[in-house]
Amino acid sequence: MFSIFKKKIVVPHIRLSGIIGNVGKFKQGIDFSSQQEIIKKAFSLKKIKSVAISINSPGGSPVQSHLIYSYIRSLAKKKKIKVLVFAEDVAASGGYLIACAGDEIYANSSSIIGSIGVIYASFGFQDMIKKIGIQRRVYTAGKNKSTLDPFVEEKEEDIKRLKNIQLDLHKDFINVVEKSRGTKLNTKSGIDLFTGEFWSGSKAKSLGLIDGLGNADEVLKEKFGENVVIKKFEKQKSWIAKKLSSGQTNQLERLLSKFEEKEIWQKYGL
């Protein structure tokens, strides 16, 4: 005897949004410790064959990006679950590294994808403190402890040391992309994919950085039918955190955080 009720397919849907790094109590963003339990719960649903992950991030900490990427891949491998990733406005730098945890990656035609590189930025204030008559005093144990001090002239050996670290991080990033995308990468395009450049979703598809165009809702319905049940998993602020973050004592911290986030998002016109 056949049941007249068709069994519905359930797909857990995780959403990761914001700058990647140390989130803290009052900052919006993504880090491993704040997302680990959510990711674990999504992969723990019974009788699922796929997990969907939407990501909207311009990047941030390479370590936190790699921790999240590795955790998703380890759960997917252990539980034999397919991971479908959906880029929203932007999946760039560390955001794209996390996206590489997907067996398939989708994006909007206007999404910003890529930025496979490493950046370090700072300021030099050595002339300013001379003009205003400030004398800087620094005492260290270890000759390289004050590397890249913004209040003294840059040293050639410091820059060389920094660039060597950047090269190591860049190689790690490239290895993740090549492992994830494999033969999907368009190596005949004549475009170097690993210069830090970023592209629209449409161009990223032709370069093999993503698999297709579309949002989570339409792609999941296309794959699993109109009756697919999309169960959302997303970090929620606790009641007490909401109350605390609205207090005046945290206004300066939140304002500085907003300026920092705005600067990173603006790189991609957002």
Predicted regions located by residue number:
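N-terminal organellar transit peptides
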Residues: 1-108, 119-270
